[in-house]
Design a protein with these regions (language model features):
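Conserved catalytic core of two-metal-ion nucleotidyltransferases
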Residues: 1-9
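Short helix/loop capping segments that flank catalytic or ligand/cofactor-binding pockets
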Residues: 9-12, 80-82
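Surface-exposed beta-strand edges and their flanking turn/coil or helix-capping segments
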Residues: 11-16, 121
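E2/UBC-UEV (E2-variant) core
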Residues: 16-32
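Conserved nucleotidyltransferase catalytic core and NTase-mimicking acidic/glycine-rich helix/loop elements
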Residues: 35-162
Length: 162
């Protein structure tokens, strides 16, 4: 009896898609100036502070790639915050001939038929808009501090301050 030791095989299309998607971040990041790369890091800290950074399904937040795309389109942290503070429902960031039905449309800089904004919840988008407006009214280093964990805040009745 002959037993094949070959692993499960997939059409080459999947490999191509994997390489293509992995390469997107590198291609966008390579187009950013050093100043813009610094602004990507600043934007990520800002989003972490308001607890909307993260691409996990449960988080429904802004991925690292989305932050890179926003800086790519707007050019700097300051311009991104200004544009986000003025954001309207259904507004399109980037250029695409395809129509999308979501609260915010952020066109993938590499694939203009892909909306990066579909995974972002309306609540997280709203937090970003409101935090951007607050930052513009009163810029502060406090917008970049690590957030206090909800787990810690939930147990504040058990904390003793000396």
């Amino acid at each position: 009896m002959f037993v094949s030791a070959l692993p499960e095989c997939f059409p080459i299309q999947y490999l191509y898609d994997y390489v293509k998607s992995k390469d997107k971040t590198e291609r966008v990041y390579a187009q950013l100036s050093n100043s813009m790369k610094g602004d990507v890091r600043i934007l990520k800290k800002f989003l972490q502070h308001i607890e909307v950074y993260g691409a996990e399904i449960a988080k429904e937040g802004f991925s690292g790639y989305v932050t890179e795309a926003l800086i790519f389109y707007f050019g700097s942290f300051e311009k991104t915050i200004k544009k986000i503070s003025e954001l309207k429902k259904g507004q399109v960031i980037g250029k695409s001939t395809k129509k999308f039905d979501s609260f915010v449309v952020i066109i993938d800089p590499i694939d203009n038929n892909r909306n990066l904004g579909t995974a972002i919840s309306i609540e997280n988008l709203g937090k970003f808009v409101l935090a951007s407006r607050a930052f513009l009214r009163n810029p502060s280093k406090n917008f970049f501090k690590k957030p206090i964990s909800k787990r810690i805040m939930k147990n504040t009745d058990k904390i003793i301050v000396v």
